[in-house]
Amino acid sequence: MRWANFLHIYQPFGQQPDILAAVVEQSYRPLIKNLLSHENAKITLNINGSLLDLFDQYGYHDLIEGLAEAGRLGRVEFTGSAKYHALLPFLPKDEVMRQIESNNETNRKYLGESYNPKGIFLPEMAYDPKLAPWLEEAGFEWMIIDEIAFGGQVDAIDYNKRYKVKGTNLGVYFRERRVSNLIMSAVVRHAEQLKVAIAEDLASSRYVVTGMDGETFGHHRPGLENLLFEVFEQPDLELVRISDLADFYPEVVECEPVASTWASSPQDIASGIQFISWDDPHNDIHKLQWKLRDFTLAAFRKMDKKHADFPALRGKLDSALASDQFFWACARPWWSIEMIEEGAYYLLDILQHLPAIDPYDFETGQAYYHQIVAMAFSWKRDGKIYEIQQANNNAMRIPFKERTLEAGGAEPAVYQAFIDMMTNQEQEASKRRDYEAAVMWRDAVYKIENKTDMYEAVHAVDLLRTTLPNDEVEATIARYKDEYRRIRGGQPEQRGIADPS
């Protein structure tokens, strides 16, 4: 098995310096230090240009130098991206290309010759078919997107083959959810545990592409950075960069990826709401945010490019196209009034400084801004945020035992299948003397049996699904139940309503 691990690191361009300092010490600095100290380390990395600007602004020049050195040593392959983490499916072609080229310029400025991207990471792995020819035109050989993009289902990729988008020469590498979520969920915290969990893969000739936020290691998951550093030391793990895979897997298959993100579920895609965290058709704040974004973009396009203020306002617009404000307004469960207001203000500020803007146009934009802020405060004050989050969690608020064993019909078979699989995981962990994992599975069974499982951030059923290969889970369930179907998203902390199993 060859393992291509992709990491994405990013902070909003206006990130508070104290938050940035925490992430630097907890995640970025340890990561770069260990990339430089382990000769066998190999990763593919995206760092948005906006984060490199922050490193420079706040004096983290050692991080910039360390990344450049890791690139020179061949331990890091850098990808392209959108400089300000814009959601590319929602932009016209010229803005997409500008975000990409601005990111290239910034990365080259700081990283020098180490930055020579063959591939591109789309923020949130947000893909739309219209992007493929544009990315090829931008000079990229491949992109990394989630496996859900392959027909809207998971576990359909043959990782002994490579893929390219039909009608183009743009290669596609699909992020595998099971192994990615196994790590992100901290189900495994040591290299030996990981090797046990992927033993079948290790013995094969296939490749694995994992993908996650770099902040997972140390910041989101304190202590999990040690797993990554242990992986760098394992002689029996063949680590490669994504571009290296072409040297080992010559067969290429055409495919037609569907619109998706790395958080989309099959249900999201079937329902046409694959971008729900940023564009929820039932979220009135989202609707206003997009109206203000589109209005500002249209107003800016009327500006004379020869005007002295054009470059400064163009730069402001680039950064204002970031996806953050939409994400923090989704309330499933992510919510921040500060981020909502800040994103709207950046757009209003552009309108305010457009020369010769029609007063009526400015008043229209200002009205959008006030509506967004007022609605955000109203949702918080009136409890709507709580209602949305509660509705989002309704399925998980019902104990698994009630949804299965006590539901009658064929559902008790589902309950027993999962209890038996978890019990088996406990026993296997005990045999390996992995008592931490054994206790985790023992406690999971106890909570399910006593109906206290609905309070877990990551449910035991989801943990089991990241621990065992999907075909093994399905085969086990098939022995207990004639028909079984699951609907779940691509990230371990779910923001969508989950199926009972």
Map each language-model feature to its residues:
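Short phosphate-engaging motifs
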Residues: 127, 216, 437
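Composition- and surface-driven signal marking solvent-exposed, interaction-prone regions
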Residues: 186-188, 221-226, 329-334, 441-443, ...
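Catalytic alpha-helical scaffold of carbohydrate-active enzymes acting on polysaccharides/glycoconjugates
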Residues: 1-118, 125-174, 181, 188-204, ...
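Active-site and substrate-binding clefts of carbohydrate-active enzymes
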Residues: 2-29, 33-38, 159-161, 168-170, ...
